[in-house]
Amino acid sequence: MAPKKAKRRAAAEGSSNVFSMFDQTQIQEFKEAFTVIDQNRDGIIDKEDLRDTFAAMGRLNVKNEELDAMMKEASGPINFTVFLTMFGEKLKGADPEDVITGAFKVLDPEGKGTIKKQFLEELLTTQCDRFSQEEIKNMWAAFPPDVGGNVDYKNICYVITHGDAKDQE
């Protein structure tokens, strides 16, 4: 496979769910920005595209280290879907779903996909950015525990990263 085709195939692995995060107008605006940055029009933003974009904005002599750091923010080649995903994650201010799920899994050594309501509530009200009683009340309204007092953290992770509750099957 030619190197350019391999790049495109790897880039195609970006999340397609990102398109549901934005309305059509926003997607079009991101597409226009992507097109401006993709200076050589190959459908992939690379280090030279970034360098050329900075030059077009009057910022010459951008250090390679700075460009490398920008490129490393993506997991691979930056096609439009990856570009949109990166902005979606930045704008939402949330970590990717697998990172959030991984954090919950630490609290679920048996791997059941649930955490006891009482334990989660204690953590949320006593650690780091503590939840208020109002926030706890809202959380249980949105994610009610089952009859055994267990909370489905996979659903919480999905809602944090996608914005809507996952259909229960």
Curated annotation (Swiss-Prot):
One of its GO terms (biological process) is immune response. Keywords: Calcium, Metal-binding, Methylation, Motor protein, Muscle protein, Myosin, Phosphoprotein, Repeat. PROSITE patterns: EF_HAND_1 (PS00018), EF_HAND_2 (PS50222). The modification Phosphothreonine is found at residues 25, 35, 101. Ca(2+) binds at residues 38, 40, 42, 49. It comes from Rattus norvegicus (Rat). It holds the Pfam family EF-hand_6. SMART domains: EFh (SM00054). Gene3D superfamilies: EF-hand. This chain binds calcium. It comes from the Eukaryota. The modification Phosphoserine is found at residues 15-16, 75. Myosin regulatory subunit that plays an essential to maintain muscle integrity during early development. Plays a role in muscle contraction. Residues 25-60, 95-130, 131-166 form the EF-hand domain. This is Myosin regulatory light chain 11.
